[in-house]
Swiss-Prot record:
Main location: cytoplasm
CDD domains per the UniProt record, alphabetical: AAK_UMPK-PyrH-Ec
Protein name: Uridylate kinase
Cleavable signal peptide: none
Organism of provenance: Bacteroides thetaiotaomicron (strain ATCC 29148 / DSM 2079 / JCM 5827 / CCUG 10774 / NCTC 10582 / VPI-5482 / E50)
Pfam annotation, one family: AA_kinase
Keyword hit for Transferase: yes
GO cellular component terms, semicolon-separated: cytoplasm
């Protein structure tokens, strides 16, 4: 029995690389599509936002001499590429999926609106919302917070390469311990890098809980949806 009726699933672009150094790993993409299909078959309405860091990151582009606005726009296009790839993988797995874009670019994807996204989800389609917020200077974490709030999701599931939030980076500090749950106030007080400050504050102010979990372990998405205590829950 699914704990949530409607979710916003946030995936990082880097996670799509799998074992590669760059781009999209077809095996990882197929694994993600299979996990998403599994919870879709339980009747969960699914909205997805994917980053673009496996292709281009706006902020690092600024450090390489690109104008920040142009760099962020290139990053937005990278999220569209990833969204199209995931959409194709979902369709190949037998699931209806639709890509909506924050900036008009028909026929690549339909222009995003809250009402279009909700209508598609209620009709059994998985909706992938690409292009960030459509504006520079906003991360895809902020874009996913915005979309999660707009589509009235019950929760944001932040699929990462680590199994939750720790007191410190577990790869650098062997004494780091994991939180099973933590409040937004505590996240902000400790300066924990769950998401950027704008995204975190948006979720806090709009009472959208986040579950940070390891998406790369097959079966974890279903466990989170079923209410199993894996990962870290962030709440008010």
């Amino acid at each position: 029995m699914a704990k949530y009726k409607r979710i916003l699933l946030k995936l990082s672009g880097e996670s799509l690389m799998g074992e590669k150094q760059y781009g999209i790993d077809e095996k990882r993409l197929a694994e993600y599509a299979a996990q998403i299909k599994e919870i879709h078959e339980q009747g969960v309405q699914i909205g997805i936002v994917i980053g673009g860091g496996n292709i281009f990151r706006g902020l690092s582009g600024a450090n390489k001499g690109f104008d920040r606005v142009k760099g962020d726009q290139m990053g937005m296009l990278a999220t569209v590429i990833n969204s199209l790839a995931l959409s194709s993988a979902l369709v190949a797995a037998g699931v209806k999926a639709r890509v909506l874009t924050a900036v008009r670019m028909e026929p690549i994807g339909e222009f995003y609106s809250k009402w279009k996204a909700i209508e598609c989800m209620e009709n059994g389609e998985i909706v992938i919302m690409s292009g960030g917020t459509g504006n520079p200077f906003f991360t895809t974490d902020t874009g996913s917070s915005l979309r999660g709030i707009e589509i009235e999701a019950d929760v944001m599931l932040k699929g990462t390469r680590v199994d939750g939030i720790y007191t410190a980076d577990p790869e650098k500090d062997p004494t780091a311990t994991k939180f099973s749950d933590i409040t937004y106030d505590e996240v902000l007080k400790r300066g924990l890098k769950v998401m950027d400050l704008t995204a975190t504050c948006m979720c806090k102010e709009n009472n959208l809980p986040i579950v940070v979990f390891d998406m790369d372990t097959v079966g974890n998405l279903k466990k989170v949806i079923s209410g199993e205590e894996i990962g870290t829950v962030v709440h008010n």
